[in-house]
Amino acid sequence: MKELGRLITAMVTPFKKDGTVDYAQAQKLALGLLDSGSDGLVVVGTTGESPTVTWEEEHALFAAVKSAVGNRGKVIAGTGANSTQEALENTLKAEKIGVDACLLVVPYYNKPTQEGLYLHFKTIAEATKLPCILYNVPSRTITHMNPETVIRLSQIPNIVGIKEASGKLDDIAQIINNVRPDFTVWSGNDSDTLPMLAMGSYGVISVASHLVGNQIKDMITSFVSGNTEHAAAIHRHLTPLIRSLFVVSNPIPIKYALNYLGVEVGGLRLPMTEADEKTAALIRESLKGYTIDLPIK
């Protein structure tokens, strides 16, 4: 679904000092991201600490961000779960709230078969009118969704695309070659954005775009318009920053970077911990080489 945008930011969830969700800051951050290159936002995905945000908090975040954003950008709700019934109920709630689409992660921990994955996503998609984006991230879920399963799911009309974070470029090429023409493939890894564009993907669901959204947008736009040398130069320039943002588990580095730059997003909920000094020093050093696109207010 091309209208969801080429550059989508997987937003962090801001917390107050007491650990509660800071909905006002989430709204402010959402608008800042749209002002710095993002076409849309994933709310309460991996970067938004979905495992430790309650359903009630999720729904309130969906509503708060959508209220702030309005028609300025697309709001994609992270509604996935490793229980099909819970994911279905969460998706239906997000639909009632009025989000633009949902992101459904491959079920984690319980290790379903490929047929189980197919039936999981099919069951949810057929129960909602929302556009559904699949999310393959085996580094976190253990289970890898095979290309054949994605291709099969792409025949369901409101399964509109996939966030592909496996890093398996051969599998991704197979997906792009065999899905229906309007099925959209986004990179789920910032470092894979340009290589995947070269293979025919559409864009990226990004973490680094919290900081350098305009530059990532320039890279994508340049590639699409045929200025591949400029796109490649941006990719090479951003690579050290991207590497520093994944030196430990996401969203630890990006939350540290935002707080360090003056964008108050608070800490993390256990079992995630804040960046240690070695990690923090590496991120601070990396940031010195970059212009930050996000408005700092």
Curated annotation (Swiss-Prot):
Where is this protein found?
Cytoplasm
Q: Any idea which positions bind pyruvate? A: 47, 205
Molecular function terms, GO-annotated:
4-hydroxy-tetrahydrodipicolinate synthase activity
Covalent S-S links between cysteines: none
Superkingdom field: Bacteria
Q: Which GO terms describe its biological process?
A: diaminopimelate biosynthetic process; lysine biosynthetic process via diaminopimelate
**Pathway the protein acts in:** Amino-acid biosynthesis; L-lysine biosynthesis via DAP pathway; (S)-tetrahydrodipicolinate from L-aspartate: step 3/4
Q: Which Pfam families match?
A: DHDPS (PF00701)
| Catalytic site | 135, 163
Enzyme class of the recorded protein, top EC level: lyase
Q: What is the E.C. number?
A: 4.3.3.7
Lipid metabolism in keyword set: no
Keywords, ordered alphabetically: Amino-acid biosynthesis, Cytoplasm, Diaminopimelate biosynthesis, Lyase, Lysine biosynthesis, Schiff base
**UniProt-listed SMART domains:** DHDPS
Where is this chain primarily localised?
A: cytoplasm
* Residues marked Part of a proton relay during catalysis (site): 46, 109
Reactions it catalyzes = L-aspartate 4-semialdehyde + pyruvate = (2S,4S)-4-hydroxy-2,3,4,5-tetrahydrodipicolinate + H2O + H(+)
Q: Which CDD domains match?
A: DHDPS
The record ties this protein, via InterPro entries, to: Aldolase_TIM, DapA, DapA-like, Schiff_base-form_aldolases_AS, Schiff_base-form_aldolases_CS
Gene Ontology CC terms = cytosol
Q: What does this protein do?
A: Catalyzes the condensation of (S)-aspartate-beta-semialdehyde [(S)-ASA] and pyruvate to 4-hydroxy-tetrahydrodipicolinate (HTPA).
Family indicated by similarity:
Belongs to the DapA family.
State how it assembles.
Homotetramer; dimer of dimers.
This chain belongs to which protein, by name? 4-hydroxy-tetrahydrodipicolinate synthase
Please name the taxonomic classification of the source: Bacteria, Bacillati, Chloroflexota, Dehalococcoidia, Dehalococcoidales
